[in-house]
Amino acid sequence: MEHSAELRAALDAAEQAAAIARTLYQRNVEVRIKADKTPVTEADVRCEIAIREILEARFPAYGFCGEETGSRDAQAESLWLVDPIDGTKAFVREYPMFSTQIALMRRGEIVLGVSSAPAYGELSFAERGCGAYLNGKRLAVSEIAALDAAALSSGNIKSLAAGKQWTRYGALVARVNRIRGYGDFLHYHLLAGGKIDAVIESDVNILDIAACVAIVTEAGGRFTDLSGAPVTLQTTSVLATNGRLHAQVLAALA
């Protein structure tokens, strides 16, 4: 399987970040609280610096938007989107539900993504028109088409719980076959691999999810916000499904 130069760069950057994360994981790293009240560690910063150096060296004309080191040329036609440690709280509490997320957005559309979870042992990637893969195996979403047969996973849903859709979400939960809360990278990997059928989140930012947009869609799924709108830099919620269930879930939440 031949990769584009951009995907090779993203994979190399993810590998470098994984090496750094492994050296610092379960090492009692110092934690600082940022202005937005989220934690940051040495691992977050070092991983992003390493990723940024690789991507900017190979593609100096591309823009960059990172969780820790900020943005450069954010209006560029091609824009890297990077969360070096998505799941910093998991990293700090020493359980393996953290990952590195690297995506490339071109003219407003996500064209490739790499989702690397070194402590969990999963590496997933996708590029437009080339399919999605997990640990070298081609991914495909499920063919489940009925809610009463579907497995639904929810992640960050705090604002959903405080809004008018909460009652509708509860009714949806009662209709599906199985409800879980895998969260973070894992439920997107599972969705792309046909292990679950839908994912709902109401509190995300684009850096959390951009790579998984590419992975889910290249596996045959559909990825929008909770209103059904396409993913943009401003997206804060997620409905991701195998595609067959998308309209039904949107209708249930409307």
Model region roles, listed by residue range:
Residues 1-85, 244-245, 251:
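N-terminal subdomain of lithium-sensitive/metallo-dependent phosphomonoesterases centered on the IMPase/IPPase/PAP
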Residues 21, 44, 55, 88, ...:
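Residue-level signal for inorganic ion chemistry
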Residues 32, 72-74, 107, 125, ...:
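Solvent-exposed alpha-helices and their adjacent loops that cap or buttress functional pockets
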Residues 44, 48, 67-68, 83-86, ...:
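Acidic active-site catalytic centers that drive phospho-/nucleotidyl reactions
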Residues 74-133, 148:
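DPxDG-like acidic metal-binding loop motif
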Residues 134-135, 140:
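A structural micro-motif at secondary-structure boundaries
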Residues 140-254:
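An extended, acidic
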